Amino acid sequence: MQPNINDEVSNNAVLDYMELHQHLSEKVEEEAKIDFITFVRLMAPKLISDWKMGKHIEVISEKLKQLESGEIKRLMVFLPPRSSKSVICSKLFPAWYIGRNPEHEILTVSHSDQLSSDFGRSVRDLVNEEDFSKIFGGVSLRSDVRAAGKWKTTQGGTYYAAGVRP
């Protein structure tokens, strides 16, 4: 039985699609390494299943990117509850920052030790994600210091979590 030309075309189209998809994924990962909003779009759905982008997320993300680059020195974010402040500022941004600067120290302070530890756990878990490794290859956690409130990278960086109240 001779191969059908339509089957051959279909197989080639599938292979072309797979190659294009792989190339696009690599480009997005490269962009996520340098652009925080791209990182947010890629990683936020891992934290919130029904994640939706809003203009306020784009504005905050741009300001956080400027903070990381040193363009601005301080940033205060004021938004109503349930506006994704914690997801962006206390989970995704520290993960992106440590991916770009794995030798730095980060301190997260919240109103309670428990909330700070919860943030630390989320950031640590993001750093352990396979997608994070694709973006920031080579950044990994030390196996001997991995508590939610204090963990270290193999590059010498440290994440600390502290609360104003116990």
Regions found by a protein language model. Give the residues of each.
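Contiguous, well-ordered alpha-helical segments that form the cores/surfaces of helical PPI scaffolds
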Residues: 61-65, 87-99
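Short alpha-helical patches at coil-to-helix transitions and adjacent helical residues
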Residues: 57, 86-91, 113-116
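Conserved nucleotide-state-sensing and coupling region of NTP-binding domains
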Residues: 109-160, 165
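Alpha-helix boundary/capping segments in eukaryotic regulatory proteins
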Residues: 83-89, 99-105, 110
